[in-house]
Each structure stands twice: as C-alpha cells, then as structure tokens.
Amino acid sequence: MHSQFDVRVNLTRFEKSVCKYEEAEIREGQILFWGSSLFTRWSREYDNTPLEEMIRGKDGSQVAVNHGIGGATAEELLFYYPRMVQPWKPRALVIYAFPNDAAAGYSPFEVMALKAKLLDHARVHMPGIRFYLLGVNLRTKYLDEGSLWNTTENRMLQHNELLEDYCRRHGDCTYLPVHQSPLFYATPEDAGHYEKVRRDIFVEDGIHFNQEGYDLFAQFIRESLDDIL
C-alpha cells in the first residue's frame, strides 16, 4: 500500500519486526497502538512496564495491542497497514508518527496526508472504528541548540495544527495534544510550551521516555481514552 508521494525510505527495512508481530496471536476488537519508537520502547525490552499492562480496561481486562516499530514513518505505517492493522480488526487505533518522517524529508503536510490515507482505508475495512491521533511528542533534544530547535519546534507545531484541524472535521477522530498536558511539566503554567518540559522524564538521548515518563504518558492515555476503556 503506497502513498502518492515520492517514497523516501526503504519500505522493507522493518520486515523482521513486522514478521515478529505476525507470529503473535491475533486478538480482534482491541485498541491497537500503531506508530514509531514512542510505542516500541513502551516494553520490557527497554526496561519499561509494557503498554499492555499499563493500559487496561476498567474491569482489569486486556484491551491494548502494541505494534510499535522504532524508526518508522507514516509512509511505513501506511505500507504495513494491511498486515499490522487490518487482520486485528481493532475497535480503536492510536497513531503516532512524525519525528522520523521529518528526518527523512517529509513535510508536516505530507505526514498528515499519509495518516489521512491510512485512516480512510481503516474506515472501509472496519466501519465504526475510532481514531486517536497523538500530537508530536515532547523531547529535550535540540532544546539548547538555538535555531535548530526553533526549526524543529515550528515543524512539530505545524503538524499538530494539521492533526487538530483534521480531527475537528472528522467525528470519528480525537486529537491527543501531549504537549498541552500539565502532567509533563513542573508547573501547570508551563503546559503547552515544548521547551519547558521536565528533563528528568527522558533517557539520555532526550527523545524517549524513561519509566517515569511512561508512567505519566500512561496516565495521559488512560484519561484520553477513558470512554472506551
């Protein structure tokens, strides 16, 4: 499944990861998390409590499936949709991608268009499915690098605006603005300002959450998905 844009990544580079997920038992009707390393690292492999254990139904039942592929772009989320999403027939889809796309040369608009195409396919195959589109996640990398940070932040904010606008126009979509949640800041007044995020909730690379970061992120997700848990 391809987009209308020039493909800027090797679409088969994550074949091993995809095959590994395909070996697992298919559980239909779950909330499927489909995205890049924000989800991949939410696992014991990275010394974090797994997503499936932290996002549970209100009755304690298992409701989530984690299909994170570290390094993936929206182009690859679309390409692998027939294998990684469609067979599971999820009742809800939580989607995250952007940083890797920007690094590969995709514009905020192109990333939004790729996500929209993925959602269009899901609507056809799974009528009534709900979508949750995560805004660009917080980070501390580049914060102290002046113009590089300004360029990075502008792209993130532009993509967030596109996500918010798309969700406003589609009743089956909910926009989840991570950067606006006070959970990730020292004071509520700092919420919404990427540059004021707490630095102690990330691992050394300044991009990925540590366990405390994932504890907060899990709370954010549970609150955001409360009506379907």
Regions picked out by a protein language model, each given a short descriptive name:
Residues 1-70, 75-76, 80-89:
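Serine-esterase "nucleophile elbow" of acetyl-processing enzymes
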Residues 46-52, 185-199:
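Short, flexible, mixed-charge acidic loops at enzyme active sites
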Residues 68-70, 94-107, 136, 180-181:
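Cell-envelope and extracellular/periplasmic
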Residues 77, 198-229:
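Histidine-centered active-site loop/cap adjacent to the catalytic His
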Residues 81, 115-120, 160-164:
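Generic structural signal for well-ordered alpha-helices
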Residues 108-118, 156:
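Charged helix-capping and loop-helix junction motifs
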Residues 126-130:
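A short helix->loop->beta-strand "cap" motif at the edges of active sites that frequently abuts
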Residues 141-180, 212:
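Substrate-gating cap/lid alpha-helix
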